[in-house]
Amino acid sequence: MSQLSYSAIKSLFVFSVMVISSPAEALVVLQQAAIPMGVEHDTNPRMSSTEKQSIWRYIATPRYSISAVADRSRWYSDVSLRLERSSDKRLSVDREDPNVVVGWERDSERDRFSLIGKYNKASTRFTEFDETGLVVNDASSSTRSVAANWSRSLTERLNFSLGGQYLTTSYSGGNFTGYSTKSLNSTLVYDWTERVRPFIQVGLTDFNPDGQGRRNTKSQNYLVGAHVDINPKLNVSASAGVNHLSSAGNGRIANTNFNYLGERYSLRGSLERSVSASSIGNFQESDRLSLGYNYDLSDKSRLGADFSWRKNNSLNDSESKQLSGFYSRDLTEFWQMRLLLQTRNLKSTNRSANGNVAGITFTYNIPEF
């Protein structure tokens, strides 16, 4: 994919859309592109508790997106490539990590249907920091997924949705276990009032780890909750239920989140207990807390902060905390600057470590064309 030019991607995309769409439908095509370029300093990329060694990373991530709208259908694709160079390749290798998203969605009076395919390659230093805490080796994680979703308005107040996904994750380097999952989720929502919408949710996942002698595990989630619009600025969603693992029995799960939108600022947060697939070769139970804050200083500048905490209960118990702050400014109509400061802390069975990251990124945004 990285060897194809943007013009070739566009031509193939538009041709596919024209073949599928009806000749009577007017086709509108939109394109966008951006090139973020930056440098960051990481004081402890290996998250070592005894031998901290710092590096400089030089990063460029060209992105291209295209979408086509015809009547009630929309096709879209997003492609990016993260190019990373390190000042010390013993600590952090040079990387070329692609990310591809291709999707289609269609609406009718009562139904909505969508298909989406994804491919993503990334460093396990980022993917496993929260997931398992295994970040010593700079390995690679490659994830491929295909998902389909359908929703329907059964009555004026009752809505039903059904979704399925097939996902595979593989690793190169490190002591990680690749796996595949097949999942099915359904949700029934009732519009009780204009502000309160209770729901029931059921989720089934089949987990198959790679390697001989490893057994597959089945997970079942049953949740009851409600979406509540407290006022035009604040909405809250809360749910609680039971998870059943074929290998471990029953456990409790829950999720609460909120969003507040002020005149110049926004707040968001979530608190969750979940059971999910992981690279340790099985499901793991996790408790998570995340908070976010954004503030518009002016029409051209803004700042924000994010905090996350996660505790994993599995074969490799770990606890991670991360606090980030940023400042961004629109330098011109097409150029943007972003400053980032971040501190991280990781505790696991055999370590307790911390590290800091400081970086600056300049982004050139190519407008719609």
Task: State where each predicted segment sits.
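Cleavable N-terminal export/targeting peptides
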Residues: 1-30, 367-369
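Gram-negative and organellar
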Residues: 26-369
